C-alpha cells in the first residue's frame, strides 16, 4: 500500500530591504521578523531600489515584487502592513495568492487610510488598506479598538487575531536588581528591638538606623547610624 506523503505548509515572512539595507524597516517590523524567524518562519526577501536611475529603479522594483511568483504552492506568507512602496505591490500579492493558492496574513502596524498623515497619497493608502481587507486570510491587529474599526470596514471578525500589545521586543536587561540597603527608624532600644544586634551578621545588606536609645556597640561596617 502506498502511503500519501503529507505536505507541510511552508511559512514565510515578507522581508523588504531597501538598497540591500536590512535596517531600513521600522523597529516594529524588525522585531516581528525576529519573532517569526524564532518560530520557524523563513524570510522571503525582496530587495528594492530607492536610489539610482529612476527607470532602472522602476523596472528592478517591478521584477523584485514579481519574485513572489516563486513562492511555494500553498505557503503561508506574513506581510507587514503598510509597505511604503508603490501600491501595485498589493495587486501582485493578490495575483500570487490566486496563482499559487497561498495564505496571506497581514500584520498591521498602521492604517494610513485612518491616520490620514499623507494627504497627497491618501487615495493610494485607501486602496492598499481596502485591498488588504479583501485578500487577507488572517489579519493581526494590536487591540480591540483596531478590531472594532476593521469590522466597521467590512472585515470578518473571525479572521482577525488580537495581539493585545503594540511594541514587541525590549533590549533592556530583564534581570531585576534590588537595592541592598534597609532603613530602620524608631525606638532602637535593644530591649525592644533585640534583632538589631544580629544585623552585623548580614554582610550582604547595608542598614541605616534612625532613632533613639541605640547601643552603639552594635555598629559595624554594614550599619550606619
Where are these regions (language model features)?
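Membrane-proximal helix-turn-helix segments that form the acceptor-binding/catalytic region
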Residues: 66, 72, 95-101, 121-138
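Helix N-cap/beta->alpha junction signal
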Residues: 81, 109-110, 143-145
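Conserved catalytic-core segment of nucleotide-activated headgroup transferases in glycan assembly
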Residues: 169-170, 174-223
Amino acid at each position: 500500500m502506498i502511503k500519501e506523503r503529507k505536505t507541510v505548509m511552508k511559512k514565510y515572512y515578507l522581508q523588504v530591504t531597501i538598497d540591500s539595507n536590512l535596517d531600513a524597516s521600522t523597529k516594529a517590523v524588525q522585531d516581528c521578523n525576529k519573532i517569526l524567524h524564532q518560530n520557524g518562519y523563513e524570510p522571503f526577501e525582496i530587495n528594492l531600489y530607492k536610489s539610482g536611475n529612476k527607470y532602472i529603479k522602476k523596472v528592478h522594483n517591478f521584477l523584485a515584487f514579481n519574485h513572489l511568483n516563486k513562492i511555494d504552492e500553498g505557503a503561508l506568507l506574513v506581510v507587514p502592513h503598510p509597505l511604503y512602496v508603490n501600491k501595485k505591490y498589493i495587486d501582485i500579492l493578490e495575483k500570487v495568492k490566486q496563482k499559487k493558492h497561498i495564505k496571506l496574513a497581514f500584520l498591521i502596524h498602521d492604517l494610513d487610510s485612518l491616520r490620514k498623515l499623507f494627504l497627497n497619497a491618501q487615495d493610494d493608502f485607501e486602496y492598499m488598506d481596502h485591498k488588504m481587507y479583501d485578500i487577507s486570510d488572517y489579519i493581526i491587529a494590536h487591540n480591540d479598538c483596531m478590531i472594532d474599526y476593521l469590522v466597521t470596514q467590512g472585515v470578518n471578525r473571525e479572521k482577525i487575531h488580537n495581539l493585545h500589545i503594540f511594541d514587541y521586543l525590549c533590549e533592556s536587561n530583564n534581570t531585576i536588581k534590588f537595592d541592598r540597603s534597609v532603613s530602620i527608624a524608631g525606638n532602637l532600644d535593644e530591649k525592644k528591638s533585640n534583632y538589631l544586634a544580629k544585623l552585623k551578621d548580614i554582610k550582604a545588606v547595608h542598614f541605616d538606623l534612625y532613632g533613639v536609645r541605640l547601643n552603639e556597640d552594635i555598629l559595624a561596617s554594614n550599619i550606619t547610624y
